[in-house]
Amino acid sequence: KENNKKEDTTTQSDLAKIQAAGVLKVGITEYEPMNYKDKKGEWTGFDTEFAQALGEKLGVKVEFVEINWNNKYNELSSGAVDCLWNGMTITDEGKKAASITNAYAENAQVVVMKQSEVGKYKTTDDLKNLKSIAIEGGSAGEKAAQAAGLTNTVVSDSQALALTEVTSGSADACIIDLTMANAMTGEGTGNKNLTYSIKLEAEEYGIAFRTGSDMTAKTTEMLAAMM
């Protein structure tokens, strides 16, 4: 799951401001199993519940704000959201654009395609023979594709949409997080004819706050106590 940033708006304790407002605004995209809507239209998922547990400990409500992930650091630095908590991969670029907590989960980027085709593609070089590979713009999947030298990529607005491109046949494959691939492909899912094969990069998830925010250390401390 790393772009432009604006001037930092943190002028006082983020923790104090959040507690005074009574709300923690969390920037997310719809990304199962981390953040997605249930049948009632309510946000649920691993990161959703984790964020709500943190909010409860802070004594504030949690508001989930859908953002364009490709513009996430602008959303953060402008104050539109207080943090980014959406299966966000910790990267060197991210550390320059924001203040990120210690890792709370491990993951990997994987290539998803139709089960009937997966046996034909066993290496990253094989993937270069595909017509198109869908990726989420600004995601770890995009960086993994770049690192693998894949130029046959098409950008989607989210990982869920990248997966839809494969289901519909608009793309031959997609690169998404292992957590999503496990939750949304194979038997018992809506994409039973899809599977994943090649793992591209291992990664760790963290939560991003504004540069200089005291929420980073506070959240790292609270996460350690919750895990």
Q: Whereabouts are the PLM-identified features?
A:
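Extended ligand-binding regions for polar small-molecule ligands
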Residues: K5-E7, T48-K57, Q115, S139, ...
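Extracytoplasmic small-molecule ligand-binding "clamshell" domains
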Residues: K5-G87
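Alpha-to-beta junction loops
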Residues: L24-K25, G59-K61, S78-N86, K131-S132, ...
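Ligand-binding cleft/hinge of the Venus flytrap
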Residues: Y36-K40, A51-V60, T124, S139-S158, ...
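Short helix-initiation/N-cap motifs at beta->coil->alpha
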Residues: E63-E75, G138-A140, V154-S168, E203
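A ligand-binding cleft/hinge motif common to bilobed small-molecule-binding domains
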Residues: M88-K96, A144-Q146, T167-S168, D172-A202
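Flexible hinge/capping segments at coil-to-helix
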Residues: T101, Q115-S132
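Periplasmic-binding protein-like
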Residues: E106-M113, L178, N182-A224
